[in-house]
Structure formats: structure tokens, C-alpha cells
Amino acid sequence: MEATRSDDPSLNPIRNRNPNPNPNPNPLSTIISSAQVWPTIDGPLGLTEEASVDYARRFYKFGFALLPWLWFVNCFYFWPVLRHSRAFPQIRNYVVRSAIGFSVFTALLSAWALTFSIGGEQLFGPLYDKLVMYNVADRLGLSGLA
């Protein structure tokens, strides 16, 4: 009589079971996917989703009132919404638009500043003295040197 071997996987169903059914053996992927996503950077201490939509909308609209730094604040505060593309679609709409607006504003401001500082008097000619702001007090007679 032959004894059955206990180390044969076909005979022992408990040993045949895969302890990790996830085909991706990366343990970090399960941690990241199971973590709750919050709309703001301060996590559970932050705003509710309804209040977040209101704040994102306000930051976006006030950014058009010549306060484009609010677009940066909007992108920073709602960074988790930018990172996770499928989370919070109502908030994401305002945050992505704020990111685009801030990028365009930064590009235009940088181009203007570089053109003015590099080009200077050679680029603008006699108009340069009227454009610069360091001699406004002298031009208006406010410095007392006239």
C-alpha cells in the first residue's frame, strides 16, 4: 500500500491556493489604490466635496480679475484633484482651467519681463525712458531734485 505524499499540490487544496491573487506583485500598487483620495491637500481636515467645488469655482473666476496667482493657489490647494484624473470631475474642470490660465499668464509675464530686461533701450529706443518706472518721481517732480 502506497502512502500519499502530503507535499503533492494537486492533492492538498490548501497549498494549491495562491496567497496573492493580484497578478501585479508590486505591494505599493495595492496601498495606493486602496488609499482614499481627498479633494484638497489637507486631506480629511479639508473641505467637503460640495464646499471644494464652490472654492475651486471662486478661485477660478477671481483669477480673471487680474489675480492670476489665485489660479496657482487653486492648483496647489486642489493638487490631489490634478493628480488623480478620474476623481472629482466637477472640481477638476476648474482646477485644470486654472492650471492652463496660470501657465499662459506665466509665459506672457516671463516673455514681457525678458523682452524688457534683455532688449532694453536698444529694442524700445526713445520710448524706453517713458516705459521704465524708476524715474517716475523725477518726471513728476516728486523727488525734490528738480
Swiss-Prot record:
The chain crosses the membrane at residues 62-82, 99-119. Residues 1-26 are annotated as: Disordered. Residues 1-61, 120-146 are lumenal. Residues 83-98 are cytoplasmic. The keyword Transmembrane helix applies. GO terms for cellular component: Golgi-associated vesicle; membrane. It is a multi-pass membrane protein. Pfam families: PEN-2. InterPro entries: Gamma_Secretase_Asp_P_PEN2. Keywords: Membrane, Notch signaling pathway, Transmembrane, Transmembrane helix. One of its GO terms (biological process) is Notch signaling pathway. It is found in: Membrane. Residues 9-19 have a biased composition (Low complexity). The keyword Heme does not apply. Probable subunit of the gamma-secretase complex, an endoprotease complex that catalyzes the intramembrane cleavage of integral membrane proteins such as Notch receptors. Probable component of the gamma-secretase complex, a complex composed of a presenilin homodimer, nicastrin, APH1 and PEN2. Belongs to the PEN-2 family. This is Probable gamma-secretase subunit PEN-2.
